[in-house]
């Protein structure tokens, strides 16, 4: 997926299979809205998401906001989300903003509660 404006730096959100995704290019003000729109469709069918950021070339506070939005989405829809190789600028902004711990909040399983198995005893 790419943003529609030719002036905006490009990004790519690639599905690698099994709930794994790779984001490359810009992760910031110029692309965050388009990345969010693309991710809604791509993430919907996965209970566990693993997102790789090693190919991100630019990031800013909007990138941090997007990562936090994905965590909020994951909690709301009872998904697990893990981030790999978060860009250093985003980590620095998160540290200064005192939200570093939130970047790991989506890592624990928050799936739906399973109903207990039905009793095998006979009913009268």
Please name every model-derived segment.
Residues 1-59, 69-124:
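STAS-like cytosolic regulatory interaction modules
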